[in-house]
């Protein structure tokens, strides 16, 4: 009888909720996809918005000059591109990894943004897998039903673009200057991002 009473005391709302929260935290810790999904839900309620510079017809977009060095990437077909050869194009460049929860969370919004510009010869997307594992990245894109173009680094990346934090997103103007730099996950479905790219692409 005493044992039954002890069991009833143990099965309190407080104890059960503590167990549920502990399990949830452990799942978030060990399953980056679940954590990514949680962040994605928060994006839908207006959190994790990118800090896009204000644009007006009367003022130019503030920019930072491009680093004076070659920046090379290899695409999924094995072709190497030089960033300096892409002058005349607005470059949306994202540094990510398949195991990074904020990267996973923001990918669908970047994919939708890419869909708007994939046929625009003046805008280019470069999704850089920082681990340099092309096959794993392509498998990730296929599994998530994403059509983003994957690249890996073929040389040193200037710290002005990427200093180790993931995800990192930069947007370069048509002259190769740094017009936007954001650390951490963000919702790139925000109309301000589209307006910003459109302004740069004019």
Regions picked out by a protein language model, each given a short descriptive name:
Residues 1-11:
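N-terminal Lys/Arg-rich, disordered targeting/topogenic segments
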Residues 89-91, 95-99, 165, 175:
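Short pre-active-site segment immediately N-terminal to redox-active cysteine/selenocysteine motifs
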Residues 105-144, 152-160:
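Structural microenvironment flanking redox-active thiols in thiol-disulfide oxidoreductases
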Residues 139-146, 152-199:
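Thiol/disulfide oxidoreductase modules built on the thioredoxin-like
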């Amino acid at each position: 009888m005493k044992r039954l009473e002890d069991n009833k005391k143990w099965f309190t709302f407080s104890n059960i909720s503590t167990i549920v929260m502990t399990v949830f935290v452990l799942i978030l810790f060990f399953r980056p996809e679940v954590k990514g999904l949680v962040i994605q839900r928060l994006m839908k309620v207006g959190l994790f918005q990118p800090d896009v510079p204000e644009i007006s017809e009367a003022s130019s977009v503030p920019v930072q000059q491009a680093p004076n060095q070659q920046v090379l990437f290899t695409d999924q077909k094995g072709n190497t591109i030089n960033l300096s050869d892409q002058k005349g194009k607005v470059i949306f460049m994202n540094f990510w990894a398949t195991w990074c929860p904020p990267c996973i969370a923001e990918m669908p919004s970047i994919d939708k943004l890419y869909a708007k510009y994939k046929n625009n010869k003046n805008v280019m997307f470069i999704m850089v897998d920082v681990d340099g594992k092309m096959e794993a990245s392509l498998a990730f894109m296929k599994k998530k039903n994403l059509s983003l173009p994957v690249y890996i680094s073929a040389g040193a990346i200037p710290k002005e673009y990427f200093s180790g934090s993931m995800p990192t997103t930069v947007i370069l103007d048509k002259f190769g200057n740094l017009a936007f730099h954001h650390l951490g996950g963000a919702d790139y479905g925000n109309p301000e991002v589209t307006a910003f790219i459109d302004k740069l692409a004019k």
